[in-house]
């Protein structure tokens, strides 16, 4: 017995530990739709009183029918039954109208709450540091927030609404039953407790399983994406990989189905045992009430009222405790949502951050910078120093993994260095306002985003604060050397790009890169950062664009990250990186004359391109 009490106490402690989520959830719902929330709660409260009226009127109808059965169905005898029957019909009609209205209000409220939660998730996913995207744990959190917690607040609100409605009705039913014996309400509650604790136990098991199942479920979604995405369609057919990934998908889904079925089976067996316990209590109470009726201690109306009140009360108590159990379950999942929404940013501004300069006077410097990506033991930069003079074109070359792209992320303050500092005009980036630092630069990433929008919209995204006039867009197209591409499109700048939506036109990788370049140039920032800007261009297009670029970069500071020496040779100064350090620096001819790593790599690249030594 003490062991059972301790188990019950432990389960109740788990429930109470989740109570802080309730006000936070109610605040979320209130912020999403305050008026709809109040309306829905009022409707639930009124509906909670109607069953009591129905039960009470049933007793009046039965008692008024007894004289009719004894004396005959004359108008004088039947008349007293019409009033309670009419009132019962009115109550049922009002109940139906309220249920329909509450359903409509609930549907509207649900849409508003889900959209509000989705907006919070979107805002947080944009606000958090890029470092989180290097951690698988972040994607597990995001997965649960997107596909579980996004609708759980509404479910919890429904649980609380059901608890309110059932509590009101149950209190009234208890008041009705008290006249027949104080022990009846206690028996009613006791009969539902086994099912309640079964529900709590299995909801906790389900939640723990969901935590463990997040990674396999995400893997199944990945296989699903591989099998259905446009990006993978050609290679899956060429390499005949469809059956392989279908088999991998089925293996993961089979594992998840088996685990879920076992949970459902265990819960079903436990619920059956709990129902048997409740049935014994119900049978005992019913036999006691029938015995009292046979002893003429209660009327037939009382017996009818008892059966209705006890059965409904038992159902209400069970529903109330089930709502508590569901609220417990939903609160467990809401912990994931609130944990996701509480993620801290590490790239933060100082309390009195300095404004970033509108233009560079001295330049950019990396001073003994060391950095490794979150969750990685590999050092990306080690004691790295580099100077980029204002108004110059600087190229950084090196092997894949040398740390070139890491420079871009640190300079844009997407990450902060573990040691050392990145400075603009001698001021550490961490002392400046983050948004203003990022306004200083325009970046072409190594893998630019292919937005499913029109050409003009794609380019205008480079600077939404600027006026997206036709002249501005045309200038950016010209600077990127994309005039011919846009001219060939069916509707020019108004052509929808990509195949996500009907009527879209797809581009080659090189053409997409030109559109991304135009987007970068549309942002009139004093610092231009280009990460592999010509990687998808043929040699003729590369030479044409590089000739234009020297003109475009005048009075601006440019940093080019590249593995193509034909691109690097146009820079004022070239830095060669290897294993997170600069190993050579100089102009193109100067580095060739040194005969070091740059000269050796240049010769290899020229021979590979068939251009001689």
Residue ranges with predicted function:
Residues 241, 285, 303-343:
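Cytosolic ends of transmembrane helices, especially the final helix of ABC transmembrane type-1 domains
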Residues 38-98, 174-206, 280-307:
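Transmembrane helix-loop-helix hairpins at lipid-water interfaces of multipass membrane proteins
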Residues 31-34, 146-156, 208, 212-215, ...:
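An intracellular "coupling" helix at the cytosolic face of ABC transporter transmembrane type-1 domains
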Residues 1-23, 111-154, 216-259, 331-344, ...:
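Extended non-transmembrane interhelical loops and adjacent amphipathic helices
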Residues 1-51, 69-84, 102-106, 123, ...:
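Membrane-integrated ABC transporters
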């Amino acid at each position: 017995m003490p062991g059972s009490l301790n188990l019950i106490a432990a389960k109740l402690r788990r429930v109470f530990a989740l109570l802080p989520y309730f006000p936070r959830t109610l605040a979320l719902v209130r912020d999403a739709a305050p008026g709809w929330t109040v309306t829905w709660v009022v409707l639930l409260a009124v509906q909670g009183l109607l069953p009591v009226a129905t039960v009470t009127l049933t007793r009046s109808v039965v008692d008024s029918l007894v004289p009719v059965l004894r004396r005959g169905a004359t108008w004088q005898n039947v008349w007293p039954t019409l009033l309670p029957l009419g009132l019962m019909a009115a109550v049922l009609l009002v109940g139906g109208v309220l249920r329909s209205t509450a359903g409509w209000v609930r549907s509207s409220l649900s849409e508003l709450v889900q959209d509000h939660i989705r907006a919070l998730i979107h805002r947080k996913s944009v606000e958090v540091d890029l470092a989180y995207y290097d951690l698988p744990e972040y994607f597990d959190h995001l997965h649960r927030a997107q596909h579980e917690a996004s609708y759980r607040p509404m479910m919890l609100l429904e649980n609380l609404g059901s608890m309110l409605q059932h509590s009101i009705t149950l209190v009234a039913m208890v008041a009705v039953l008290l006249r027949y014996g104080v022990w009846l309400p206690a028996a009613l509650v006791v009969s539902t407790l086994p099912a309640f604790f079964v529900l709590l136990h299995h909801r906790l098991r389900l939640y723990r399983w969901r935590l463990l199942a997040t990674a396999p479920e995400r893997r199944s979604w990945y296989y699903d994406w591989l099998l259905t995405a446009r990006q993978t369609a050609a290679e899956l057919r060429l390499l005949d990989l469809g059956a392989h990934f279908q088999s991998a998908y089925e293996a993961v889904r089979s594992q998840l189905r088996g685990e879920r079925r076992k949970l459902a089976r265990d819960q079903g067996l436990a619920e059956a045992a709990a129902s048997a316990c409740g049935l014994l209590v119900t049978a005992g109470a019913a036999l006691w009430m029938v015995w009292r009726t046979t002893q003429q201690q209660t009327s037939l109306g009382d017996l009818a009222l008892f059966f209705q009140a006890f059965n409904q009360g038992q159902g209400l108590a069970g529903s109330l405790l089930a709502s508590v159990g569901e609220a417990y379950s939903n609160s467990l999942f809401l912990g994931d949502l609130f944990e996701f929404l509480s993620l801290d940013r590490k790239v933060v501004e100082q309390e009195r951050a300095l404004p970033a300069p509108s233009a560079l006077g001295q330049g950019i410097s990396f001073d003994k910078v060391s950095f490794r990506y979150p969750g990685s033991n590999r050092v990306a930069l080690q004691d790295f120093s580099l100077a980029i003079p204002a108004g110059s074109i600087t190229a950084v070359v090196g092997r894949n993994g040398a740390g070139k792209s890491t420079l871009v992320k640190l300079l844009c303050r997407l990450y902060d260095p573990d040691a050392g500092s990145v400075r603009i005009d001698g001021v550490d980036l961490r002392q400046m306002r983050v948004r203003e630092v990022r306004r200083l630069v325009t970046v072409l990433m190594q893998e630019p985003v292919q937005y499913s929008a029109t050409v003009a919209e794609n380019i205008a995204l480079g600077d939404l604060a600027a006026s997206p006039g036709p002249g501005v867009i045309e200038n950016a197209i010209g600077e990127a050397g994309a005039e011919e591409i846009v001219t060939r499109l069916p509707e020019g700048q108004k052509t929808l790009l990509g195949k996500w939506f009907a009527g879209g036109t797809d581009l080659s990788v090189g053409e997409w890169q030109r559109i991304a370049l135009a987007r970068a140039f549309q942002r009139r920032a004093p610092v231009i950062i280009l990460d592999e800007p010509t990687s998808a261009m043929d040699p003729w297009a590369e030479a044409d664009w590089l000739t234009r670029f020297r003109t475009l970069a005048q009075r601006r500071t440019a940093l080019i990250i590249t593995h193509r020496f034909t691109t690097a040779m146009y820079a004022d100064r070239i830095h060669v990186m290897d294993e997170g350090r600069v190993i050579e620096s100089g102009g193109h001819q100067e580095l060739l004359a040194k005969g070091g790593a740059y000269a050796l790599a240049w010769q290899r690249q020229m021979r590979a391109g068939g251009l001689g030594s």
